[in-house]
Amino acid sequence: MSGEATAAVAAKRSVRAYAVEGDKTMDIFDVQSVDENILRVRTPLLFEIGEELSVRIVDDSSTRDTFVRVRAHVGPSDMRVTELEILS
């Protein structure tokens, strides 16, 4: 599936992702696309490659808490997309 098609699927499904720290959720991710186990997000924060984060993924039909690992930062610096690998 092309990046544009995947982004369209994410938009249609209204997928959102939030960083979770303790009992707080932080709206710091703009989900660009979702594949089977990869979230591609834009964020104002720069996470380290390999860093693991607790996140809440919400779509039209479900909510789940999981962990992700920062896999890569791709694209030009002004349009940087962070790839998050879903671990569980």
Regions of interest found by a model, annotated:
Residues 1-88:
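Structured alpha-helical
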